């Protein structure tokens, strides 16, 4: 591990339309090759779709979806006496958010709708209702942690 001082976390400015930091972080995660305007168009397009199709507040749907997808526990490999054990550990809050956003992005990419905005809208709506690819991923991680609960005494 490096022995230098800890690098400070960078402040993320809230997004221009909703004034929400989480939306801005999600846009930054979605962005490819520094094209923020494209990422903005995708996210705001998805929010528009949620508004028109569901008639719900898109920001609320986004927040509920994120909270539903956030993992509580995950497994980490730990070597003990020549054997590797999958040890369940609690996920710290910043990593929870990052994983939830990453899983939402990946699940949206795998969907079959025409545009990324439509895919993202579908995934966010489904995640808010407790189903979809991102929720499946979260449940899979929780299942792994539950299956390896016997090794929880090998805490890090």
Swiss-Prot record:
GO terms for molecular function: rRNA binding; structural constituent of ribosome; tRNA binding. Part of the 30S ribosomal subunit. Contacts proteins S9 and S11. HAMAP family: Ribosomal_uS7_B. GO terms for cellular component: small ribosomal subunit. Keywords: Ribonucleoprotein, Ribosomal protein, RNA-binding, rRNA-binding, tRNA-binding. PROSITE patterns: RIBOSOMAL_S7. The keyword Ribosomal protein applies. This is Small ribosomal subunit protein uS7. NCBIfam families: rpsG_bact. GO terms for biological process: translation.
């Amino acid at each position: 591990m490096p022995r230098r001082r800890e690098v400070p976390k960078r402040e993320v400015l809230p997004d221009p339309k909703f004034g929400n930091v989480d939306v801005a972080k999600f846009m930054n995660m979605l962005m490819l090759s520094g094209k923020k305007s494209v990422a903005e168009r995708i996210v705001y397009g998805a929010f528009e779709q949620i508004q028109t199709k569901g008639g719900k507040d898109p920001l609320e749907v986004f927040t509920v979806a994120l909270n539903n997808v956030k993992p509580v526990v995950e497994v980490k490999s730990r070597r003990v006496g020549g054997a590797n054990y999958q040890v369940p550990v609690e996920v710290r809050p910043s990593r929870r958010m990052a994983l939830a956003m990453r899983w939402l992005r990946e699940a949206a990419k795998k969907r079959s709708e025409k545009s990324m905005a439509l895919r993202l809208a579908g995934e966010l709506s489904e995640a808010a209702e407790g189903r979809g690819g991102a929720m499946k991923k979260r449940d899979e991680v929780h299942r792994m942690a539950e299956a390896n609960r016997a090794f929880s005494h090998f805490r890090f």
